[in-house]
């Protein structure tokens, strides 16, 4: 038990913690020096008052400092969602990552088991023959040789094991629900990140700015999804040159049609895997259009295009040429050789 944490818990209930105070608190948590009741007390004090950007940045900075880091190629980016939107859609961010890699942008994708979809990122990758429980050396090899890798959060953030039982017992959302996208082990400076709530996109963008990111889009779909939606408008908090601006994205401005929400609903992991394979084979669908929209945004964040329609064209070429499928096959081969 840490006596040093007690005054910080009390302070957190009354006022925002400074970044230094919050870093001290999370250092204690991640070292396993806090009791479960202390962990729960701190997390709920922060949630009840409302977490600040300084507190998010502090927790993320401590997590980053303690992670099993990997080296990534210059210009690598992350494409990730918080999960937890409860919508059960097809896995769009994972498919988008392979398309963007197929278009020539290195993708160091951070993720975990499913939160709300019936098939989360790790589950979708397993359907494609990709082993996700691999360490930093395999991740670095994949990034170097084929320009894409998947980093399973528990393999890179061992310190979170101290907090997981308390999170499970609390049974409610805490700031840990958004820390994953803020703690990429490859230290990427560019990312397309979905949030389960519109209220989170600005504070998450401001947190990434405080952590030194260069360019990021934090997005939330009007249908409640944690990505750019193909069903209508999406809201974006964009980080560039240290400033955050908010704007909207509509599928039509990327040259894509609007689809009904039912068209992007997922199923079992096997059904979602089949949809993923059909997408990579070039099949036209709402799923393809959703991936094209998100890939176009990612390519814009990466600096490869300046307009969404150009990003859609580049992404479509990555699919139809077989380049995206080749990335899937390459990652499956590298990870299978390592296990």
Swiss-Prot record:
Bound cofactor: record note: Binds 2 magnesium ions per monomer.
- Record bears the keyword Amino-acid biosynthesis: yes
The entry marks the following residues as binding 5-phospho-alpha-D-ribose 1-diphosphate, namely 81, 84-85, 89, 91-94, 109-117, 121
GO CC list = cytosol
User: Which processes are annotated in GO (biological process)?
Assistant: L-tryptophan biosynthetic process
* Keyword list, A-Z: Amino-acid biosynthesis, Aromatic amino acid biosynthesis, Glycosyltransferase, Magnesium, Metal-binding, Transferase, Tryptophan biosynthesis
Top EC group: transferase
In the Enzyme Commission scheme, what number(s) does this protein have?
A: 2.4.2.18
- Provide the transmembrane region boundaries: none
Tell me which domain of life the UniProt entry assigns to the organism this sequence originates from.
Bacteria
Please tell me where Mg(2+) 1 binds in this chain: 93, 227
Q: Recorded GO terms, molecular function? A: anthranilate phosphoribosyltransferase activity; magnesium ion binding
Residues annotated as binding Mg(2+) 2: 226-227
Pathway the protein contributes to:
Amino-acid biosynthesis; L-tryptophan biosynthesis; L-tryptophan from chorismate: step 2/5
Alphabetical list of InterPro entries matching this protein: Anthranilate_Pribosyl_Tfrase (IPR005940), Glycosyl_Trfase_fam3 (IPR000312), Glycosyl_Trfase_fam3_N_dom (IPR017459), Glycosyl_Trfase_fam3_N_dom_sf (IPR036320), Nuc_phospho_transferase (IPR035902)
Q: Where does anthranilate 2 bind?
A: 167
SUPFAM superfamilies attached to this UniProt entry: Nucleoside phosphorylase/phosphoribosyltransferase catalytic domain, Nucleoside phosphorylase/phosphoribosyltransferase N-terminal domain
Q: Which reaction(s) are listed as its catalytic activity?
A: N-(5-phospho-beta-D-ribosyl)anthranilate + diphosphate = 5-phospho-alpha-D-ribose 1-diphosphate + anthranilate
UniProt family annotation = Belongs to the anthranilate phosphoribosyltransferase family.
Which PANTHER family does this one have?
ANTHRANILATE PHOSPHORIBOSYLTRANSFERASE
Function statement = Catalyzes the transfer of the phosphoribosyl group of 5-phosphorylribose-1-pyrophosphate (PRPP) to anthranilate to yield N-(5'-phosphoribosyl)-anthranilate (PRA).
How does it associate, per the subunit comment? Homodimer.
Protein name (Swiss-Prot/TrEMBL): Anthranilate phosphoribosyltransferase
Q: Which organism is it from?
A: Dinoroseobacter shibae (strain DSM 16493 / NCIMB 14021 / DFL 12)
- The protein's gene is named trpD
